Amino acid sequence: MGNRGRLIAPGGLRDELAAVAEDEPAAGESLAEMAAQYGLRPSSARPRLVSYLVKVWQRRHFIFAYATARNVSMYTEARLGQLWQVLTPLLNSAVYYLIFGVLFKANRGISNYTAFLVTGVFIFAFTERSIVVGSTVMRANITLIRALHFPRACLPLAYVLVEFQQLLLSMVVLFAIVLGTGEPLTWYWLLLLPTLLLQATFNMGAALFMARVGAGAQDISQLIPFLLRVWRYFCGVMYSIAALPAELPVWAKNVLSFNPAAVYISLTRFAVMSSYRADAPGAKPYNAARCAIFTVKKTPSMQAYCHPDITASELWLAGVGWAVVILVAGVLYFWQAETRYGRG
C-alpha cells in the first residue's frame, strides 16, 4: 500500500532525512567549505604553533619519564652497565692525547693539556650524540608514533634529555680529572650551569631539525657521523685555535672560534680551568715582545700578552645567540611536518 495514510512520529526517519537534505552542500559549495562553515577540522591536522607548544609542555612528565627509562635501559645488556657513559669519552680522550698531544704536539700553547682535551671531548660528545640520535629518533620509534597520538616533538626532546642526563654523570669524572690536574675550585665553576643549559637548548633545536631530516631521508644517518667527525676537527677539541699558525687569517680563526660547538667548549674551559683564563689573549696588558714569543714558541704564559681576537663577553653572546636561533629554527622546521611523521 505504500506510505499513504501512515503516521510517522516526530523525530522519525522522515525528519532525519529532511535534516540530512538540509545539511547537504548547496550547489557549487565544496565539502571543504561546508566543513569550515561548521568548524570541522581533520583529526590529524597540524595544530597551531602556540597550541602545539602548550601540548608539548603538558607532556613534560612523559618526556622526563621516557628519557629516564631509556637511560636506565641503554646498557642493561653490558656487563659494565652505565659506566660506558663515562668510559667511552675517556677512551676517546686517551686516543686523542696520544695522537694529537704526543705525536702531533697539539699541546703547544696550552698549560694544562689533559684538562683542556678532556673538557673538549666531553662537551663535544654531548652535541654529537644529540644530533646522531635526533637523526634516527623518528624511524626508531615508528611503532609508537603510529600507535599513540601525541606531539611528535616529545621524542627528540626526550632523547636530548637522555644525553643531558648522561652528561651530568660524565661531569663527575670531568671534575675529578680537572681538579686532579691542578686546577683549583673557584666561583667561576658556577658559570658551568648556564653554559650547559645553553648547550642543551642548542642541542634540542639541532635534534628537532635533524629529526625531520632523518624522517624523510633515511640515508642521512650514514652521512651524519662523517660530518660530525669533520666538525670535531674544526672545533678546537684537540688543539687551541688561538695557537694556530700566524699565517692563518684572523677571520678564519674567528669562524672556527664562533662555530657553536667551539663556543660551548670555550665557555666550559673558561669556567673550570684557571690556567685557560690566565693564558687567554688579553688576560694581561698588551706586550708586543712577549706576544711575539708566543707567536714563535707557543709559550702558554706569553699568550696572555696578545690582543684578544674574541672576548669572553662575545663568546657568551654567541652562546646565547646560537641557542635561541637554532631552537626556534628547529621547532618551526619540525612542527611544519608534524602530520607527516609515521607515514613512511
Spans of features found by a protein language model:
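Hydrophobic transmembrane alpha-helices and immediately adjacent juxtamembrane helices
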Residues: 2-344
